[in-house]
């Protein structure tokens, strides 16, 4: 019988429900249970694909092409797994499905309502995923009390009734502030949040109390008393330096152990040895390199969350910490490349649109001409081609037709299948595609394989008409699409210490114990630049 754990949030948003859910999933998997995570996003968008990163953080891309919430990236990294588009349930998806069924006459003339039709659709989607698992952790986005989240909380309540209390548990993540004026942790916001949850028919089984410092015993007792949750199930989740410490903290607090007993699962000791070694190694690193990320969404670091994590994974693999220098691409246009002085490596990440593109190309040229380890990703790959065409081939005015449709040298152009589309959502080249890697190249040394599968999210590509000219000037296209040999996937400069760019997003498949090869190589090159081989 599948066990369900619903994770809800209260008091304020941004508490770390995603990390809590991912950590709990990892602890269950470490006990040998077949575990997966589902994220519910109550917004009306069908998916995250058309959202501004400043509003919602990065758009994470799955193997099947799903454009989803960044929390699914945390789930994949913590559980070392690959999820599907169905693992992200949105209000947009649910309502679209219900309206489609109504139009087909599947409700037999009934008045279609939130209860039971919307709630039934939600439950059906959760159960569809659950068939192959022992434990399913469902994170409900937003905060208890939000209008958008009400149908999902109601569906969760109904699931406990239908599946049986012994098969469904609730974990509520709250915030316990400490006021400087009185110097004590205040539990009243948590009490009110649980009161709101109970008014919806849900009694939490465990409370994860987020705070700056470890939860005081007096606060733990008070939360237990006023929320009707056992003291052992009031979990202290205080701020830590590294999110990968959270599973170890929650294990020490006994959250998974308590839920295993609560759900009648066999009690097992988790295998956390490798995870603990990884965390301890990261904390003990004494060398440091600085890598610049030159982007257009750098004011919100979550816009590039997977890149941050891939650098962290690679830092452990290379015995050196990575300090990130966040640089707004438009600032490079205004202030020049002096903003890049002293860095040990440069990344130009993905993005869309003209804003900051010239600044990104200034950074690419600086890396190329000064032999600074460089990695370009997606749009960064395309702009690397543009920069090379302009400054090495001498094609003045060369550009991508995305930015300059009238460019005399369209070295980057819209893919043929992307023309004449009447909608933006879900229409890019999305998901995992095969990439064929050429022998005797940097890419082959990094990957060690001839064929790799990497995740994509793009509409533009290197114009096949210019490939021969670019290669004759020294640019090496070392990776080619498996589905179209005229589509370039990886480029590199062989006479450079480390200069590589990819049309795909390698960060989406990077894992704590298995860093993405191009990131691992970048950090290694940065370390060698600073400390020698």
Swiss-Prot record:
Residues noted as binding Mg(2+) in the record, renumbered to the chain: 71, 139
Subunit and interaction comment: Homotetramer.
A GO biological process held by the record: pyrimidine nucleobase biosynthetic process
Family stated for the protein in its record: Belongs to the CTP synthase family.
Transmembrane segments: none
Entry binding sites for L-glutamine: 54, 351, 379-382, 402, 459
Catalytic activity entry: UTP + L-glutamine + ATP + H2O = CTP + L-glutamate + ADP + phosphate + 2 H(+); L-glutamine + H2O = L-glutamate + NH4(+); UTP + NH4(+) + ATP = CTP + ADP + phosphate + 2 H(+)
Binding-site positions, UTP: 13, 186-191, 222
One MF annotation (Gene Ontology) recorded for this entry: ATP binding
Name the UniProt record assigns to this protein: CTP synthase
Stored SUPFAM superfamilies: Class I glutamine amidotransferase-like (SSF52317), P-loop containing nucleoside triphosphate hydrolases (SSF52540)
């Amino acid at each position: 019988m599948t066990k369900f754990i619903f994770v809800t949030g209260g008091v304020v948003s941004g508490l770390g429900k995603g990390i809590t859910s991912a950590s709990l999933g990892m602890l269950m998997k470490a006990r040998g249970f077949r575990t997966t995570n589902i994220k519910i996003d109550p917004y009306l968008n069908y998916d995250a694909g058309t959202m501004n990163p400043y509003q919602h953080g990065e758009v994470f891309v799955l193997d099947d092409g799903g454009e989803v919430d960044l929390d699914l990236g945390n789930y994949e990294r913590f559980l070392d797994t690959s999820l599907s588009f169905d693992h992200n349930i949105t209000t947009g998806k649910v309502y679209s499905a219900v309206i489609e069924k109504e139009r087909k006459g599947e409700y037999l003339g009934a008045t279609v309502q939130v209860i039971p039709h919307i709630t039934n659709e939600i439950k059906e989607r959760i159960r569809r995923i659950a068939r192959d698992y022992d434990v399913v952790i469902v994170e409900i986005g937003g905060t208890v009390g939000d209008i958008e989240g009400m149908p999902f909380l109601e569906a969760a309540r109904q699931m406990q009734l239908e599946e049986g209390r012994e098969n469904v548990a609730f974990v509520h993540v709250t915030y316990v502030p400490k006021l400087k004026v009185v110097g004590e942790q205040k539990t009243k916001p948590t009490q009110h949040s649980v009161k709101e949850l109970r008014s919806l028919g849900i009694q939490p089984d465990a409370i994860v109390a987020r705070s700056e410092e470890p939860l005081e015993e007096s606060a733990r007792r008070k939360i237990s008393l006023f929320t009707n949750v056992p003291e052992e199930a009031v979990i202290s989740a205080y701020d830590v330096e590294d999110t990968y410490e959270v599973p170890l903290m929650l294990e020490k607090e006994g959250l998974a152990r308590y839920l295993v007993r609560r759900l009648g699962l066999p009690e097992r000791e988790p295998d956390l040895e490798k995870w603990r070694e990884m965390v301890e190694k990261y904390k003990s690193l004494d060398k440091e390199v600085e890598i610049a990320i030159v982007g257009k969404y750098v004011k919100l670091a979550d816009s590039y969350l997977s890149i941050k994590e891939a650098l962290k994974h690679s830092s452990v693999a290379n015995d050196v910490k990575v300090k990130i220098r966040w640089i707004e691409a438009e600032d490079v246009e205004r202030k020049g490349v002096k903003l890049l002085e002293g860095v040990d490596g440069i990344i130009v990440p993905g993005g869309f649109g003209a804003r900051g593109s010239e600044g990104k190309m200034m950074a690419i040229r600086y890396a190329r001409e000064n032999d600074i380890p460089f990695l370009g990703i997606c749009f960064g790959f395309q702009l690397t081609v543009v920069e090379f065409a302009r400054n090495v081939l001498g094609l003045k005015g060369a550009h991508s037709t995305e930015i300059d449709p009238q460019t005399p040298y369209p070295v980057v152009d819209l893919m043929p299948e992307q023309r004449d589309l009447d909608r933006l959502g879900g229409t890019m080249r999305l998901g995992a595609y095969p990439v064929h890697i050429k022998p005797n190249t940097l890419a082959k040394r990094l990957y060690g394989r001839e064929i790799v599968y990497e995740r994509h999210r793009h509409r533009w590509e290197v114009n096949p008409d210019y490939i021969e000219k670019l290669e004759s000037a020294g640019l090496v296209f070392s990776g080619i699409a498996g589905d179209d040999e005229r589509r370039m996937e990886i480029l590199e400069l062989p006479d450079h210490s480390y200069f590589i760019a990819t049309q795909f997003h390698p960060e989406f498949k990077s894992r704590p114990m298995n860093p993405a090869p191009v990131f691992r190589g970048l950090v290694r090159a940065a370390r060698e630049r600073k400390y020698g081989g």
